[in-house]
Regions:
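Sec-dependent bacterial lipoprotein signal peptides
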Residues: 2-34
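Long, intrinsically disordered, low-complexity segments
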Residues: 36, 232, 343-346, 419, ...
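Membrane-proximal, proline-rich intrinsically disordered regions
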Residues: 36-83, 572-604
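Aromatic-residue-lined binding/catalytic grooves and analogous aromatic/hydrophobic interfacial grooves
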Residues: 37-39, 173-177, 202, 206-210, ...
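Conserved, well-structured interaction surfaces
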Residues: 61-62, 69, 97-171, 192-203, ...
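Flexible, polar/acidic helix-loop-strand segments at domain edges
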Residues: 362-425, 468-470
């Protein structure tokens, strides 16, 4: 009898017995999530093997959700590796040695650092491989239709691709395993699976994802998509075009990267202007009648009137409850964690300084300095996103707040629920700006800066404009796709382009634009300056979310190692930890030499 393997978290057993309801709940955060009532109409305990498991669409859906249940266990490693190794997050005095070594870039194979362990990533990959084989068999045996197969194939393939990208970013060279295997330790057998370098891996991943038959979201009328217990699943699954955009960005195929990101930015375009606010606001970083996600003050010059709660203003990007309608304007890929179901939400333990928190990681002085260096439109001298991304701002023990705004240590200390936001509108806009800036079109960097600053309409309206005819301004249509934005707002006759509400990253943050210095006249010099602006704004906007190390590494690899090395040096040299300060210069030299990757240590 064949084994069921990773699909149901059994890696070496020939036959397993599982509590079916409990498994579904653990894998899907309470999969009453599925609208199919027959999903729960199953005997409480059921013995399964591969041949008996893949019988119908319900089985296929449970297998897909099992993949995501396993992937959710990677949240802690993902955030820690992508932030602690970079410049915006550092260990506290409460941190364990593994976190300190990551931050100090002193990880060695013999230490068995739990965060530098590739095995959890490969558990997800091998789960994907098993499910992909099972789905193919179901298709061949006519147990699911071709459309059902294509949708689930492409989704699981995208999860596997995303995991491989993370492995490549952190370990540099990794085994590329694309088939089901008996033992997870076979992964580390070079005669079976030779290692690919990061760029070789990316080429493989691009080719694989380009072969996928279905890049759209799941149709809304199938069992996988719905909601239960307050958790909406429409943003739960990986955005395949966003993933392809990331791969193209790494590969240096900037036009294709921009095309993929632009598709997300145009999520509501097919609805047409008749859809009203949804058409103008979804994924466009737009102002609206209530400025739901803007940095806002109740009183213009009263610093204490800053909107700082879970349902108003910029902080609500992270604090809004699941399924709240305006969240669809900004959330691209989000996973929700519930205290009643596995896996456990790890970020209360890592970041909170109360209740069940262990306060192991905190904002670095580097990011605090960056926020404090900004001046808002009302002349308040800090970036409000600093307060709105943290807790205990201005104290000796600031906390990373983006993951813990829904945690209440006083009333419900054991209720550790939260969300893992892997992609949102702002991160897509910033990556689009990075891709556009690398294109060779004349003046294209101005578009990138418009996305960063106050929006397209402001950037492409001449300073001396005073008329009513906006036909030839407030747009970038001359660039052609994927850089053709129409932000025109005219009244004679009335006209509203789909991007007329666009306000830019800094515009939404209530910050004035940062303009290109007059002494920068060369094209390449302008591109580097604009790229540095993108890097800085990414820090201010996306701090702690898991984007930092990939961005710095990507740009360092194509431009100059100092992009990464100088920023990590800045973090370490400003630390209150003497060991970190003492290591700063050595770490800079290490990163300048191209020594960027963790040891691929496999503990058997």
């Amino acid at each position: 009898m064949q084994k069921l393997t990773r699909i149901l978290k059994a890696q070496s057993m020939k036959m397993i017995s599982i509590p079916f309801k409990k498994y579904i709940a653990a894998a899907t955060i309470s999969v009453g999530l599925f609208s199919c009532s027959d999903m729960l109409d199953v005997e409480p305990t059921l013995e399964l093997d591969k041949d008996r498991y893949y019988q119908n669409q319900l089985d296929a859906d449970v297998a897909v959700m099992g993949v995501y249940g396993e992937m959710m266990k990677l949240a802690e490693q993902y955030v820690v590796l992508n932030e602690v190794r970079a410049d915006l997050m550092e260990p506290t005095m409460m941190a364990d040695a593994d976190l300190v070594d990551l931050s100090n870039h002193s990880v060695v194979a013999s230490d068995n650092n739990k965060y530098a362990d590739p095995k959890p990533f490969y558990r997800v990959i091998l789960n994907c491989n098993d499910v992909l084989e099972g789905l193919e068999r179901m298709r061949d045996e006519n147990r699911i239709t071709e459309d059902q197969y294509n949708q689930r194939l492409s989704d699981v393939a995208a999860v596997r691709t995303w995991v491989y990208l993370q492995l490549g970013i952190h370990f540099g060279e990794v085994p590329y395993v694309t088939k089901s295997i008996e033992s997870i330790d076979d992964v580390n057998n070079p005669s079976l699976f030779p290692k690919l370098s990061l760029m070789e891996l990316i080429d493989e991943l691009v080719e694989y994802m380009e072969s996928m038959p279905y890049l759209d979201a799941y149709p809304s009328n199938i069992g996988l998509v719905g909601s239960s217990a307050g958790y909406d699943l429409s943003t739960y699954f990986v955005n395949k075009r966003g993933l392809l955009g990331d791969l193209y960005l790494w590969q240096g195929n900037y036009i294709k990267a921009a095309e993929m990101f632009r598709t997300i930015m145009e999520s509501s375009t097919s609805m047409g202007p008749g859809a009203g606010a949804v058409y103008y606001d979804r994924m466009r970083l737009s102002w609206s009648s209530s400025n739901y996600f803007n940095v806002r003050y109740g009183k213009e010059n009263d610093i204490n009137s800053l909107f700082n709660d879970n349902i108003n203003g910029w902080r609500s990007i992270f604090g809004r409850p699941a399924g709240e309608r305006y969240s669809y304007d900004v959330w691209v890929w989000v996973m929700h964690y519930d205290s009643d179901f596995a896996p456990e939400y790890p970020f209360i333990r890592l970041f909170a300084n109360e209740g069940e928190g262990e306060y192991q990681l905190k904002p670095s002085q580097s990011i605090l300095d960056k926020w404090n260096s900004q001046t808002q439109w009302n002349n308040v001298e800090f970036d409000a996103r600093g307060i709105l991304s943290t807790k205990n701002w201005g104290t000796m023990e600031p906390e990373v707040g983006k993951f813990t705004f829904n945690y209440n240590a006083m009333s419900t200390p054991l209720q550790k629920e939260g969300k893992w936001i892997l992609e949102r509108a702002a991160s897509v806009h910033l990556k689009f700006a990075e891709a556009a800036n690398m294109d060779n079109l004349d003046g294209i960097s101005q578009l990138s800066r418009a996305l960063i600053n106050e929006g397209i309409r402001e950037a492409f309206t001449p300073d001396d404009f005073s008329g009513d005819d906006v036909t030839d301004i407030q747009n970038t249509l001359e660039y052609g796709a994927p850089y053709d934005f129409d932000a025109r707002q005219g009244d004679f006759p009335t006209y509203r382009g789909p991007w007329y509400r666009h306000q830019g990253i800094r515009g939404r943050a209530y910050l004035p634009p940062i303009t290109l210095p007059e002494d920068i006249t060369g094209v390449q010099e302008e591109k580097y300056w604009t790229e540095d602006l993108i890097i800085q704004e990414s820090a201010l906007e996306l701090a702690f979310e898991g984007h930092r190390w990939p961005q710095l590494l990507r740009i360092a690899m194509r431009r100059d190692p100092s992009v990464l090395a100088d920023r990590v040096y800045d973090k370490l040299s400003k630390s209150k930890n003497a060991e970190a300060v003492g290591r700063a210069a050595g770490v800079r030299s290490k990163l300048m030499s191209g020594d960027w990757f963790l040891p691929f240590h496999w503990e058997e």
